Amino acid sequence: MEIFKEMCPDSEEWKFLREVSLLDIKEDIVYRPYKFLSNGEQTKILLAILFLKENNFLLIDEPTNHLDINARKIIGKYLNRKNGFILVSHDRNLIDSCVNHILSINRRNIEIQKGNFSSWEKNKQQQDELEMLQNEKLKKEITRLEKSARKNAFWSEKLEKSKNRLDVSKTVGFADKGFIGAQAARNMKRSKSIEKRKNKLIEEKSELLHNIDINERIKIHPLQFHNSRLIEFENVSLFYGNNKICENINFVIKQGDRILLKGKNGSGKSSVLKLILGENIKYCGYIYKAKNLKISYVQQNTSNLTGNIFDYINGKQIDKTLFLSILRKMDFSRLQFEKDIASFSEGQKKKILIATSLCEEAHLYIWDEPLNFIDILSRIQIENLILEYSPTLLFVEHDMAFSEKVATKIICL
């Protein structure tokens, strides 16, 4: 409540309580010190305060990074009731649920289009396809005109040379020099006209393809295990101290499965992953883990990344050339390789962890919220990778658009 009074001293308390109720925040949470709230609760409180301010056009920057799937749906429903804001988000479902225009920062320009993300994406794909077809058409026409211009120039030059070699005294009754010269001039004029048309088409072609985002293919190197069953949990309960986090967890991970581990924040998802990885998590129940199973892990936390890219890979047992190549395909410039990773955006740091995992040969890939802060283009790039190579994957992720495309099974905690 103290942050509400600090940021909105002139606003009435009942209005604040109305807004937080729409965001599914219990009233007792409102009266707790702000610093003791979870990241998701803090985000909701700040959103409620933002919309108390009248006559403002609000800027909302990535509000979902610390929210679970259910909380994201609540945020989407809440924002759908509001007007007068710009939302920056990489969550496609959230964008679809609450916006009526898309402001797209393209490679060459900025454009605004009526609709949501899905309609914008469809229009973008159609525009890209149209430009690529037009580009190919122009390329063929330019090649044809080049050949035609060269042919006319060649004949013009040949006629001009033949004119200069003529012996007028021996050519009475045949084409005279004037006729041949005129013919050569016509060919040259035609050649220059064709050249002019060609240059116009080249100029037209140069205006195409500037806003096309080429999603380069990246690869993963999953290993085949000799047995189909890799992991099994049977009636497993997890504890934090003496407090039970979750209970009666039952699932089997078989080779080829892509499993979404789903649950509210604090439901024990990360603890399940860490237990499989062999960390000291208190539990009861039966757990089977195949012997000699190779696991590649992408963690949530990026705060331990330090030094530059070359410092980072020196301590890793991975193909350095492959790692750098993947980063380049994920939109890293070569200049960034020399910079301190601590200065990178959170999305760039997460890409480093994902690129590391993609370089590791493993039977099972475990990814804990891999897409936090990752841009939409890279999310689609990773989706395509997983669908193409079908690694065995256990992951926690709150981006439902990604999860719905990638997951073959869902485990709910």
Which role does the model predict for each range below?
Residues P9-F36, N123-G241:
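Coupling and communication elements adjacent to P-loop NTPase active sites across diverse families
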Residues M1-N135, F225-L413:
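ABC ATP-binding cassette signature C-motif
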